[in-house]
């Protein structure tokens, strides 16, 4: 992690692949992080921030494809709290990345992933790729990101690059080019 940081690269920890092969890991993790103390505060927000800072990690990456637990109010509140703690402790590079089955960020989905304003971020988002290609909704997703956060920083379009025959000109318009790109490698062949 130290070498990555010296070279300007963030390191994401706790990468969880919540797919059908894990036997319900997404639901177990969601239950774990939503545990509250007797005073109503989340039990594991401070320990997670402390652990990541100690180990030199900048954030958490989630693959929530097999569940919709990320839409639960407690999950939203938990992740907002992580951002608030990180900010209060000067952990300014802290990030949470969500990857779901969604290939667009909308006014509806930004309520449970992304956030509604700069002071209440829930996560950053990697849009799911469409048919092994860029999301067709990059432009509208950028518009929603900018409406809520003032910028599209933290919004990424996934593209599956195994065949390399993607619509590489897709981000070539003034709106879509403000979306980051996440190149997605092989996992099926």
Regions inferred by a protein language model and the residue ranges of each:
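Chitinase-like catalytic core of GlcNAc-active glycosidases
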Residues: 1-137
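Extended aliphatic helical segments
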Residues: 76, 125, 142, 159-162, ...
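Mature extracellular/periplasmic domains of secretome proteins
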Residues: 113-120, 141-148, 172-174
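Glycine-enriched alpha-helix->loop->beta-strand junction motifs that scaffold or abut catalytic
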Residues: 119-123, 151-153, 176-180
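Glycoside hydrolase catalytic-domain groove-lining segments
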Residues: 134-160, 167
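Substrate-binding cleft of secreted/luminal carbohydrate-active enzymes
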Residues: 155-189
């Amino acid at each position: 992690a130290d070498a990555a940081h010296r070279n300007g690269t963030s390191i994401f920890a706790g990468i969880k692949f919540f797919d059908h092969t894990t036997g319900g890991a997404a639901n177990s993790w969601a239950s774990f992080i939503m545990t509250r103390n007797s005073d109503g505060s989340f039990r594991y927000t401070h320990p997670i921030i402390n652990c990541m800072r100690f180990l030199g990690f900048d954030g958490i990456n989630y693959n929530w494809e097999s569940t919709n637990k990320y839409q639960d109010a407690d999950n939203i509140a938990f992740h907002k709290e992580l951002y608030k703690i990180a900010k209060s402790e000067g952990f300014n590079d802290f990030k949470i990345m969500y990857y779901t089955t969604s290939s667009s960020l909308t006014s509806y989905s930004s309520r449970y992933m992304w956030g509604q304003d700069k002071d209440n971020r829930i996560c950053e988002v990697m849009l799911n790729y469409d048919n092994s290609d860029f999301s067709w909704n990059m432009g509208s997703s950028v518009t929603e990101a900018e409406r809520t956060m003032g910028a599209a920083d933290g919004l990424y379009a996934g593209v599956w690059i195994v065949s390399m025959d993607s619509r590489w000109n897709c981000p070539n318009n003034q709106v879509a080019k403000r979306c980051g790109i996440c190149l997605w490698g092989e996992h099926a062949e």
